[in-house]
Regions:
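Membrane-proximal helix-loop-helix units in multi-pass membrane proteins
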Residues: 89-158
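Membrane-helix interface motif
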Residues: 45-57, 119-132, 196-204
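Membrane-interfacial loop-to-transmembrane alpha-helix junctions, especially the N-terminal start
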Residues: 25-38, 101-107, 173-184, 209-216
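Juxtamembrane/interface segments of multi-pass membrane proteins
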Residues: 59-63, 127-140, 167-176, 201-208
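Internal transmembrane alpha-helix with an interfacial aromatic "cap," most often the third helix
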Residues: 17-18, 69-107
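Membrane-proximal first intracellular loop
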Residues: 1-70, 174
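C-terminal transmembrane-bundle signature of multipass membrane proteins
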Residues: 13, 152-244
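Alpha-helical transmembrane segments of polytopic membrane proteins
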Residues: 1-10, 66-79, 139-155, 208-222
C-alpha cells in the first residue's frame, strides 16, 4: 500500500469520526477527544507530500525556509497528544486534581518543547533541504536533535496516556475502549521510536525511507478516530434508549 493511500484512508477515518462526533465540540468531557482527532487530521494533512508540494512552496516564498508546513503539523501532533492525555485524565481524576496533573506533567513540557523544536528546525537541514516527504530529508546534527526532541516528547505524552489506559481498563465497562486506545497509543509510540532510531543511525534512513513511520502514525490516527466515533455512538445510543 502506498503512502498516499495510507494518508487518504486515515484522513477518511478522521473525517467520518469528526462527523459522527460533530456535536461534542460543546460537550466538556468529550471535546478533548474530538480535538485530538481533528489535530491528528491537520498533522497528517500538513505532513503529506501533497501539502509539501503546494502549501510548502507558498510558505517557502513567505519565509525562505522549506518544510514549514511539516513543522506546523508536528506542533499539531504535540497538541493532539496533549488533548488525548487530558481526555484520559478526565476519566480518572476529579476536576481539580486533573487540572493540576495536566498543567504540571503535560502542558508545561509541551509548551517548552515547541519553541525549542522551532530553533532546531530552523538551524538545520529541516528548513534547508526540500523533500516532498519530510521523513526523507537527510539528517544533520540539528535535524537529528529535532527528531529526538519531537519524538521523545510524543513518546512521553503517549506513554502517559497509555499508563492512564492501563488503569482505566481495570473497569470492566471501559476495558474494550481502553484496550483500543492503548493500541493506538502504542502505534504512535512505535512511529516515534522508529524515527528516533533512523535519526541516530543515518544508514537506515534510505532503507526505512519513512514508510514504517507512516504506517504506525496513520494506524495511530485512524484507530483513535474510529474508536472515538464508536465510543460516542454507544453513548448516544444509551442516552436515547434511557429516554424511552
Amino acid at each position: 500500500m502506498s503512502v498516499a493511500t495510507l494518508i487518504a484512508i486515515t484522513l477518511g477515518c478522521i473525517a467520518w469520526s469528526l462527523w459522527i462526533r460533530r456535536v461534542t465540540w460543546s460537550c466538556r468531557w468529550e471535546v478533548a477527544a474530538t480535538l485530538n482527532i481533528a489535530l491528528q487530521g491537520v498533522a497528517v494533512f500538513l505532513m503529506s507530500p501533497w501539502a509539501s508540494e503546494t502549501i510548502g512552496h507558498v510558505l517557502y516564498q513567505l519565509t525562505g525556509k522549506w518544510n514549514v508546513e511539516d513543522y506546523i503539523g508536528h506542533d499539531a501532533y504535540i497538541v493532539a497528544a496533549s488533548a488525548i492525555v487530558y481526555n484520559s485524565l478526565g476519566r480518572l481524576q476529579d476536576d481539580n486534581a486533573m487540572q493540576r496533573s495536566f498543567k504540571q506533567y503535560v502542558e508545561r513540557p509541551a509548551t517548552i518543547c515547541i519553541p525549542v523544536l522551532l530553533a532546531t528546525f530552523w538551524m538545520g537541514n529541516g528548513a534547508a533541504v526540500y523533500r516532498a516527504d519530510f521523513f526523507q530529508v537527510p539528517t544533520d546534527f540539528w535535524l537529528s536533535a529535532y527528531w529526538i526532541l519531537l519524538c521523545g516528547t510524543l513518546l512521553y505524552l503517549l506513554g502517559y496516556d497509555a499508563r492512564a489506559m492501563l488503569v482505566l481498563r481495570r473497569d470492566p465497562q471501559s476495558r474494550k475502549i481502553a484496550n483500543i486506545y492503548l493500541f493506538a497509543s502504542v502505534s504512535g509510540m512505535l512511529a516515534c521510536a522508529t524515527r528516533i532510531v533512523t535519526s541516530l543511525v543515518p544508514a537506515l534512513q534510505p532503507i526505512e525511507n519513512g514508510r514504517l513511520v507512516w504506517v504506525f502514525a496513520c494506524a495511530c490516527g485512524a484507530i483513535f478516530a474510529l474508536a472515538s466515533a464508536h465510543s460516542w455512538r454507544i453513548k448516544t445510543r444509551w442516552l436515547t434508549s434511557s429516554r424511552h
